[in-house]
Amino acid sequence: MAYGQKILKGDAYKRAAIKRRHIRIRKNLSGTAERPRLVVTRSNRHIVAQVIDDIKGHTLASASTLDTSIRGGEADKSAQAKQVGALVAERAKAAGVEAVVFDRGGNQYAGRIAALADAAREAGLKF
């Protein structure tokens, strides 16, 4: 261990690992106007999906479990993630986006992340 390096335990260690993976992934990913980046951010309670044009630095479309159309519905988090995926795909298509680059945000491609991605694909987004 390097001098001055903190020893992380529990949830802090998990968050640090996710952050490291996200940095490593983002080195090779970038969204353009033709193919913006679909970013997925997951917490213990909520999931957020944003379609971002990295060149301009603008968010073109977004959806989350905090939206009123999703908030009161399903109790199952995977079902909520599917709804978020379908909603962000619908909003992205309304903004003129057909294809995206998927950024899983350092999370494993499983569970809620995979459910959101599959729902977005079924709704017509290509990635």
Swiss-Prot record:
This protein's source sits in the domain of life called: Bacteria
Keyword check for Ribosomal protein, yes or no: yes
Cellular component terms (Gene Ontology): cytosolic large ribosomal subunit
GO annotation terms (biological process): translation
Q: A Pfam family for this UniProt protein?
A: Ribosomal_L18p
Q: Which CDD domains match?
A: Ribosomal_L18_L5e
| Membrane-spanning residues | none
Ordered alphabetically, the record's keywords are: Ribonucleoprotein, Ribosomal protein, RNA-binding, rRNA-binding
Q: Which GO terms describe its molecular function?
A: 5S rRNA binding; structural constituent of ribosome
Please give the NCBIfam families that the UniProt record associates with this protein: L18_bact
Q: Which family does it belong to?
A: Belongs to the universal ribosomal protein uL18 family.
HAMAP family associated with the record: Ribosomal_uL18_B
- What is the role of this chain? This is one of the proteins that bind and probably mediate the attachment of the 5S RNA into the large ribosomal subunit, where it forms part of the central protuberance.
Assembly information from the UniProt record: Part of the 50S ribosomal subunit; part of the 5S rRNA/L5/L18/L25 subcomplex. Contacts the 5S and 23S rRNAs.
State the name under which the record lists this protein: Large ribosomal subunit protein uL18
